[in-house]
Curated annotation (Swiss-Prot):
Family classification: Belongs to the LpxC family.
Keywords: Hydrolase, Lipid A biosynthesis, Lipid biosynthesis, Lipid metabolism, Metal-binding, Zinc
GO MF annotation list: metal ion binding; UDP-3-O-acyl-N-acetylglucosamine deacetylase activity
Cofactor(s) listed: Zn(2+)
A GO-annotated cellular component: membrane
Binding site for Zn(2+): 78, 237, 241
Keyword Lipid metabolism found: yes
Record-given protein name: UDP-3-O-acyl-N-acetylglucosamine deacetylase
Gene that encodes it: lpxC
An example Gene Ontology biological process: lipid A biosynthetic process
Alphabetical list of Gene3D superfamilies matching this protein: lpxc deacetylase, domain 1, lpxc deacetylase, domain 2
InterPro entries xref list: Ribosomal_Su5_D2-typ_SF, UDP-acyl_GlcNac_deAcase, UDP-acyl_GlcNac_deAcase_C, UDP-acyl_N-AcGlcN_deAcase_N
Length: 303
């Protein structure tokens, strides 16, 4: 039987919210089988818990935000991406601020935290959501789609008019049966343009942004002295975001995702449309490990 997984130990980190600029204390705690991923605002009395599920998605303008009443938790996608990438099903995430810490702008530090805590199997079958038929949403020149595939694959295309972008680094297809999330995706950082920075700051956003937690581009070049971590780091970060958004389905996806110029808003619309189309998916478990798509085997997920 393919089993659910949680952390072996509690692990903590401190960081800054990229939009609020506020210091935040983060604690990851093991959770029982069938809990799912639960965010806990421990700075509130009483503590407010928000499950990482599609029906709690709120604002998606610059990040994916979860809301419950008037309580919000912003920028959840990078940590969720890390949890999906290494296969953690059940977890309590305590935080002392309305936004998760941005860390270095990627999922890499979260992967390190998870690996430091250790992962253990639980005595309950792991559930997957398997795509049975295509679901697609288009909006002008943007589109997102999921379709059947016996594995986990993401294709993504971006289109920026900038000297650093070309067709080689604006399109990527990653099949996770042969691609290591940890090595090839998790370290891709969020990026932004200096030309947008003034507008964003005027709107009291990106108050915690810096060259330490984002790739920043002027008209011609990257301002970060260390340059790119991957030749296609920009599009790989978009794929990192997609993996985090998809994990709001509450289960790992068996299927293929394709996106063109999409962001958190279109991604969330696709998730809602998918769940509303009952014939397009099914929940599956695997008693026989040999039937599990290779992308989700321990060998693939720990590479």
């Amino acid at each position: 039987m393919i089993k659910q997984r949680t952390l072996k130990n509690v692990v903590r980190a401190t960081g800054v919210g990229v939009h609020t600029g506020e210091k935040v204390y983060l604690t990851l705690r093991p959770a029982p089988p069938n809990t799912g991923i639960i965010f806990c605002r421990t700075d509130l009395d009483p503590v407010v818990q928000i499950p990482a599920r599609v029906n709690y998605i709120g604002d998606t303008s610059l990040s994916t935000c979860l809301t419950k009443g008037d309580v919000r938790i912003a920028t959840v996608e990078h940590l969720l991406s890390a949890l999906a990438g290494v296969g953690v099903d059940n977890l309590y995430i305590d935080l002392t601020s309305p936004e998760l810490p941005i860390m270095d702008g990627s999922a890499g530090p979260f992967v390190f935290l998870i690996q430091s805590a250790g992962i253990e199997e639980q005595n309950a079958p792991k559930e997957f959501i398997r795509i049975k038929q295509r679901v697609k949403i288009e909006e002008a020149d943007k589109s997102v789609m999921v379709e059947p595939y016996n594995g986990f694959k993401i294709s993504f295309g971006i289109d920026f008019d900038h000297p650093l972008f070309n067709e080689h680094n604006q399109n990527a297809t990653l099949d996770f049966s042969s691609t290591s999330y940890v090595k090839e995706v998790s370290r891709a950082r969020t990026f932004g343009f200096l030309s947008d920075y003034e507008f964003i700051r005027k709107n009291n956003l990106a108050l915690g942004a810096s060259l330490d937690n984002a790739l920043v581009l002027d008209e011609y070049k990257i301002l970060n002295q260390d340059g790119l971590r991957y030749p296609d780091e920009f599009v790989k970060h978009k794929i990192l975001d997609v993996i985090g958004d998809l994990y709001l389905l509450g289960r790992s996806l068996i299927g293929s995702f394709s996106g063109v110029k999409s962001g958190h808003t279109l991604n969330s619309q696709l998730l809602k449309q998918l769940l509303a189309t009952k014939s397009a998916w099914e929940i599956v478990t695997f008693k026989d490990p040999s039937e599990l798509p290779f992308a989700y085997t321990p060998v693939a997920m720990t590479a």
